[in-house]
């Protein structure tokens, strides 16, 4: 039988608290690796007994070789008039994930080869990545892309892609039995509520509740990691 949360006095307050955490983490630029992931886990660790683990890039984990670490300082496109038409400072969705560094000037046709839009909605900025192929790009709305005039465009992506670490966090609570309950969520997607932030907020809330209990029948591991 489904739980009627409206009958639980504390539910509304808990919901507001978790929503507040999502608002804090929404602007943090996250990806598979990097300082955005570290900042996110550090914030969650203020509320729960989170253990943060860093594994060197290039490490073989089952069938996966851990990718290089990626960090971005700034990324933008300036139009012919010098105004910025796309800027990751406005939204972390604007930059193609794992874009390589670039500092160049291109014409509109060339820029168009590096722009990603959503054909289903003229006002939506899509989320796109290029983890396994070295390229660069920007994501914007189709309406903005189609309104760009002819001319020269300055493109700058100040990013690093190299040796570093893959960072994840976990909360492990001992149990009376040997079997383990694993609860996991992704931590790598930026500025996405359904796909990422809701899972992190929910696990943070669960970790606080479970950590406050004295006994657990099974070991419980709550993991925040890229999958």
What are these model-derived regions, one by one?
Residues 1-225:
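N-terminal hydrophobic/helix-forming segments and targeting peptides
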């Amino acid at each position: 039988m489904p739980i009627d949360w409206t009958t639980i006095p504390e539910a509304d307050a808990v919901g507001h608290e978790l929503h507040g955490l999502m608002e804090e983490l929404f602007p943090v630029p996250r990806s598979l690796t990097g300082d955005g992931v570290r900042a996110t886990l550090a914030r969650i660790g203020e509320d729960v007994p989170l253990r943060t683990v860093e594994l060197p890039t290039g490490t073989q984990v089952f069938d996966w070789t851990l990718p290089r670490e990626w960090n971005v300082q700034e990324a933008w496109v300036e139009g012919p008039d010098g105004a910025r038409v796309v800027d990751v400072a406005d939204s972390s969705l604007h930059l193609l994930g794992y874009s390589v560094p670039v500092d160049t000037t291109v014409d509109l046709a060339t820029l168009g080869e590096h722009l990603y839009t959503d054909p289903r909605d003229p006002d939506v900025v899509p989320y796109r990545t290029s983890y396994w192929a070295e390229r660069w790009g920007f994501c914007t709305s189709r309406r903005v892309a189609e309104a760009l005039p002819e001319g020269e465009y300055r493109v700058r992506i100040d990013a690093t892609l190299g040796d570093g670490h893959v960072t994840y966090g976990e909360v492990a609570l001992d149990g009376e039995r040997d079997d383990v309950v694993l609860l996991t969520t992704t931590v790598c997607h930026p500025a996405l509520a359904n796909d990422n932030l809701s899972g992190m907020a929910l696990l943070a809330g669960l970790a606080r509740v479970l950590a406050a209990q004295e006994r657990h029948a099974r070991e419980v591991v709550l993991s925040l990691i890229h999958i």
